[in-house]
Design a protein with these regions (language model features):
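Signature for HUH/AEP ssDNA processing cores
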Residues: 2, 58, 63-196, 203-219, ...
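DNA replication initiation modules
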Residues: 140-141, 145-177, 182, 205-302
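Heptad-repeat coiled-coil/leucine-zipper oligomerization helices
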Residues: 3, 7-10, 17, 24, ...
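Intrinsically disordered, low-complexity regulatory segments in eukaryotic proteins
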Residues: 17, 58-66, 241-248
């Protein structure tokens, strides 16, 4: 009985304290309004183990002349997927290029298995590499080409990317980009590494369910087709993430990251404007204000 009275007393005290804090917040807001001071943007707390985004002031100051670490920090705050695994581009035995999860093969386990089981055993025993600053540094320097798996373990995502990769990719991606702007959804067009396609990137202020992100993408795509009847959007290929839920035993689809140095030398893997001209300072262009991502998150949740 004593415990119940004590619990009730603490509950009443907490409720009173909460009311006092709410009144104090309202008073502070009134003072800010009186002096025309905007309410500071609060960042969403991250889940345990997740990296924090750099402060908006830090992001907005990054440009071509910034040091490499500042660029890497900015890059990782934008192009975020799973950090316990990433994909790397490699040349197969027949000379073609493909992507695979980066990791160390367990040769003893692979060679001990039958030839028909070796690929399966490799997937099961491979030690996967995690995303690090050095991995991003090598990508940006052109020493390797990496991709991310945007679908997180809890089936949320930090971003949505629309892939256009056929003959009409330019007009189709620009039409989609215009729809995003009309909906006040910040979106950014990258010419893909091949130069024959484009990715329209949309970022969120915090991870949102992939199903909501993809529904938002579909709504924007539908609006684009309704607004531009003469465009069939034949070049549209898919969204990343490409699944609402994580496939059993897999990572979901990967997307190659932009700004890879070797591709940039050919005018590809770069962000372009409405005339498909690359921005002079790529880093300044992607130095986005995280507060603007809230509009993307808000629309996705509608």
């Amino acid at each position: 009985m004593e415990d119940q009275r004590d619990l009730r007393a603490r509950l009443e005290s907490s409720l009173a304290e909460g009311q006092r804090l709410r009144e104090e917040v309202q008073q502070l807001k009134a003072i800010l309004d009186q002096h025309s001071i905007p309410l500071p943007q609060l960042r969403t707390p991250q889940s345990p183990g997740e990296r924090c985004l750099p402060a908006p002031s830090d992001i907005s100051q990054v440009g071509t002349l910034s040091d490499n670490q500042a660029k890497i920090t900015l890059f990782r705050s934008l192009f975020r997927g799973r950090e316990d695994v990433y994909a790397e581009r490699w040349r197969t035995k027949d000379g073609t290029w493909a992507y695979r999860p980066a990791g160390q093969k367990d040769w003893l386990a692979v060679l001990a298995s039958s030839p028909s089981e070796r690929r399966k055993v490799d997937r099961q025993t491979r030690t996967l590499y995690t995303v690090t600053d050095d991995v991003i540094r090598q990508h940006l320097a052109g020493k390797k080409t990496i991709g991310i798996y945007p679908l997180l373990l809890d089936e949320t995502c930090w971003l949505l990317a629309a892939d256009f990769d056929k003959k009409t990719w330019q007009e189709d991606s620009l039409a989609f980009l215009a729809t995003c702007k009309g909906a006040r959804v910040p979106a950014y067009l990258e010419r893909s590494r091949s130069g024959n396609g484009g990715h329209v990137w949309i970022f969120f202020e915090a991870p949102i369910p992939a199903v909501l992100a993809r529904k938002m993408g579909c709504a924007l795509l539908t609006q684009t087709m309704e607004r531009r009847h003469h465009l069939g959007l034949d070049s549209y290929d898919r969204f990343f993430p490409n699944q609402d839920t994580l496939p059993k035993g897999g990572f979901g689809n990967l997307i190659a990251l932009p700004l890879q140095w070797m591709s940039r030398q050919n005018g590809n893997s770069l962000f372009v404007d409405d005339d498909l001209h690359q921005y002079p300072d790529q880093w300044q262009f992607v130095a986005l204000n995280p507060a603007s991502w809230g509009r993307s998150s808000g629309m996705a949740r509608q």
